[in-house]
């Protein structure tokens, strides 16, 4: 990476102001050569009616971290990233604490990117497994 880890985290979290990420309190919390990680608090604002994490909030977390991961590796002056397909398998319920999303590349193409995103709880138990496809398009 050409810029520091701290600069990437600051840029990502600053860019999420006034977005769904801010509404859901999603924070980009770690980055490495081949991954990006975010966390989201699990509380009443992301519950489904029976008091556990809503699958839609989980998918929003997954798409957020995957899209940011793609964004880090492009020239943002010339291109933008959009999610074009996402799938999720929810494996475990969570009712409190934080969930963590770790996005890693499966495919890193010029136009499309494919991510494996694992959502875990605070004890590192697997909560959901997601796949996200993003597309990089010119700003023209």
PLM features: residue spans?
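Terminal targeting signals and extreme-terminal segments of soluble enzymes
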Residues: 1-140
């Amino acid at each position: 990476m050409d810029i520091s880890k701290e600069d990437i985290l600051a840029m990502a979290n600053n860019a999420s102001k006034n977005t769904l990420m801010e509404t859901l309190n999603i924070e980009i919390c770690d980055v490495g050569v081949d991954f990006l990680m975010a966390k989201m608090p699990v509380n009443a604002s992301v519950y489904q009616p029976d008091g556990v994490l809503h699958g839609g909030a989980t998918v929003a977390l997954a798409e957020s971290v995957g899209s940011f991961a793609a964004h880090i590796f492009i020239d943002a002056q010339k291109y933008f990233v959009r999610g074009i397909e996402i799938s999720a398998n929810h494996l475990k319920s969570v009712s409190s604490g934080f969930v963590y999303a770790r996005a890693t590349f499966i495919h890193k193409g010029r136009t499309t990117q494919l991510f494996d995103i694992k959502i875990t709880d605070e004890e590192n138990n697997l909560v959901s497994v997601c796949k996200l496809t993003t597309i990089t398009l010119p700003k023209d």
